[in-house]
Amino acid sequence: MTESREPHVAGSAAPRPEPANGLASGQPSSRARYSRVLLKLGGEMFGGGQVGLDPDVVAQVARQIAEVVRGGVQVAVVIGGGNFFRGAQLQQRGMERTRSDYMGMLGTVMNSLALQDFLEKEGIVTRVQTAITMGQVAEPYLPLRAVRHLEKGRVVIFGAGMGLPYFSTDTTAAQRALEIGAEVVLMAKAVDGVFSADPRQYPEAELITAISHREVIDRGLRVADATAFSLCMDNGMPILVFNLLTNGNIARAVAGEKIGTLVTT
């Protein structure tokens, strides 16, 4: 399973009662600009820069998501698996690409289950749906069921990518957002947004606050893979690229505050 680099289950535990999430199954709070969002999380952030999971990072992300869910916003999530495996990189080391991509998909499921656990510790009922059937740990991906979960105030995490090799989790995020009727893809990164050049190599690079899908593709800006941007461009799906490492930024993104980079058609 591939996932672009940063720029520049139902679980086995006994079912828990539905929490009293305030507006979770009703209308979003007046502060929210969006009522249904698809949050794309890079797997590398879940590892805190290392291989594996950093529980402190996952817990912090879960708290941010729980905050917006309690405000009535419907949240679906796609997570990469880069903290465990990257199919393209394994291919470069001699592995067969299809097999290495499937290994990456399993990494996304591990991340999904971890986030589910921390969200439920926050009192947020969460379902994991996977594109590859694994009934003992997650539901199969069914878009209509996912929408029903969202309407009931549950978080839905989509694992195993598209279930197909050669497709990145960025592309999965775009496709799932369109299929569940999300209003925006919130693309969480480890940088403040889209820059004119890689800010780690070029300190003078400027943050771009607004740009079109077409310009991102034409300029070759490394935000997500071109397939994901083309899919969003063709279907008028906006993308907000923002820094996940700033606490509270998910709520700011949902509220429509001017953070990061807004990519529109």
From Swiss-Prot:
The gene is pyrH. This is Uridylate kinase. Inhibited by UTP. InterPro entries: AceGlu_kinase-like_sf, Asp/Glu/Uridylate_kinase, Uridylate_kinase, Uridylate_kinase_bac. The lineage of its organism: Bacteria, Bacillati, Actinomycetota, Actinomycetes, Mycobacteriales. Residues 1-29 are annotated as: Disordered. It is an enzyme of class 2 (transferase). Belongs to the UMP kinase family. Disulfide bonds: none annotated. Catalyzes the reversible phosphorylation of UMP to UDP. UMP binds at G81, D101, M162, G163, L164, P165, Y166, F167, S168, T169. It comes from Mycobacterium avium (strain 104). GO terms for biological process: 'de novo' CTP biosynthetic process; UDP biosynthetic process. GO terms for molecular function: ATP binding; UMP kinase activity. NCBIfam families: pyrH_bact. It holds the Pfam family AA_kinase. Its main location: cytoplasm.
